[in-house]
Amino acid sequence: MTPVRFGSIVMVTLAAAGCGPAPFDRAAEQRKLLQRDAEWADVASAGKDVDKTASYWADDAVIIPQGQPIVEGKAAIRAFVAGSFAIPGFHVHWKSDAPEFSPDGKLAYMRAANDMTVSGPDGTPLNLPGRALTVWRKDADGQWRCVADIWNDPPQPAGSAK
């Protein structure tokens, strides 16, 4: 093998090795996703901007609210958010914990503890604690968006009546 030919093979091999996807940086993506989720919780907690709140879900997202029909797609989710914001005394906030990622870093899920408040029949605030599981996808634009969102009640403490 001539030196020129060997050099060409080395150059092609090095160039091909550099063409693969960038390695997945778990720590960096964890920070980005937790920050994005915290921003979403703050926007939702303000209870004012339906479009901004809905923007954190993907166009093909599905939400499964406790005791209610499944909500599919951005338009239906936007309507769900608008309806929630219209409930007297409505307020929601959550905090998610450490995400778990797919091996390629394109999907993740997180658990969360949430608190929702609504006005009771006499106007007194009712606090409704909950828990949630969200599934996130990193879209082509590099932004994390929620693709599945489900929440329910935590278990009742031992000895308490519901």
Where are these regions (language model features)?
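Bacterial N-terminal signal peptides that target proteins for export
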Residues: 1-9
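Intrinsically disordered, low-complexity serine/threonine-rich segments
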Residues: 9-11, 48
